[in-house]
Amino acid sequence: MRRKYRALNDAVYDHMTAVSMPPDELLSELIAETDELTKDWAGMQISPAQGSFMYLLTRLIGARTALELGTFTGYSSICIARALPPDGKLI
């Protein structure tokens, strides 16, 4: 599975992982493909728990437009885009 975000202690990370939604088939495939193709760089991809958190934040604020800067392989972009309304925009 993904490497944890280094700024979190084990207790916070364990809780965040336990309460977040696991990645679906598309995101799981993206994780595997990123690991395979990028090897040492795969740690740049956000974790599934972080993706769930980004989805939640996007929904909670009612975002209609989002700007994604610094995209790696698109995991966070997918999480944000899924949280936008049908007429929402991801730039």
Segments (PLM) and residue ranges:
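A short alpha-helical cap/connector motif
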Residues: 1-91
